[in-house]
């Protein structure tokens, strides 16, 4: 089975997930599988069944636009020095109750493209499965109560050079297609010193944030069109739909619309806690970002880490 990288891709069931980390940023994931749930590309924000490859180009030109509306400005800023790269492979298959017993992974081609060069990885995987009775992850189709808070607490530590967060609370977000925008809007309110929004207010804020993010795509078309998969106008039109999932481009845009940093976390069973996998908008500060938890199958929840907080900059709301 030959699998090519596709930018930030997830699949809800029977999935093989390959993650490529550049430094502390999760830069690419590929998922492939078949079930009643579609494979989903976070970079495109659209539901698709199969992926055969991808291309990435990186702009070194920072640009900014300011808006006097509810949310702030957007600034593209990419590092020019490529950080250390790491390849991870994980397997998700709860209904089939399968686990991976053997993996042979061979790098076939690796070549880079950053606006002038091309980035791609082709990986050959030989996968042998054996049965197990344990489920790999929770069902993404569940619809959580926005006030459903789950608290986890223990001492912090490090794993493979990354900090592991073990004292945290997960704020359940409904899986209605708005979960990314709901999670960011929820975190925005808390970071701004406001009360946690109720379900109705959370939905309204999420839809407003989605609209502003889509508007920024249009306003900054020359700088954003390169990382939108497929037709740009179609992509923007579809991302305005309140039930279409958002992903990495929307998180990237949201950080600049809000002028606040956003950090994405995932659970790491080997580490025994949460680790950060992506960071956006760090030019607005690195302390106390908006935090969201990504579950690896297309769903986001709001996240609180219980640690001493640094001073919080003024909101642009």
Swiss-Prot record:
Listed A to Z, the keywords are: Cytoplasm, Hydrolase, Ubl conjugation pathway
Annotated signal sequence is none
Q: Give me the reactions it catalyses.
A: Thiol-dependent hydrolysis of ester, thioester, amide, peptide and isopeptide bonds formed by the C-terminal Gly of ubiquitin (a 76-residue protein attached to proteins as an intracellular targeting signal)
Gene3D superfamilies per the UniProt record, alphabetical: 3.90.70.80
Q: How does activity depend on pH?
A: Optimum pH is 7.
Q: Mainly localized where?
A: cytoplasm
Gene transcribed to yield this protein: OTU4
Q: What's the protein name?
A: OVARIAN TUMOR DOMAIN-containing deubiquitinating enzyme 4
Q: What broad taxonomic lineage does this protein's source fall under? A: Eukaryota, Viridiplantae, Streptophyta, Embryophyta, Tracheophyta
Which Pfam families does this UniProt record tie to the protein? OTU
| Listed GO CC annotations | chloroplast
What EC numbers are recorded for this enzyme? Answer: 3.4.19.12
Q: Which organism is it from?
A: Arabidopsis thaliana
Its function? Hydrolase that can remove conjugated ubiquitin from proteins in vitro and may therefore play an important regulatory role at the level of protein turnover by preventing degradation. Cysteine protease with a preference for 'Lys-63' over 'Lys-48'-linked over 'Met-1' ubiquitin (UB) tetramers (e.g. Ub3 and Ub4) as substrates. Also cleaves RUB-GST fusion.
SUPFAM superfamilies linked: Cysteine proteinases (SSF54001)
Task: Name the residues annotated as catalytic in the UniProt entry.
Answer: 176, 179, 299
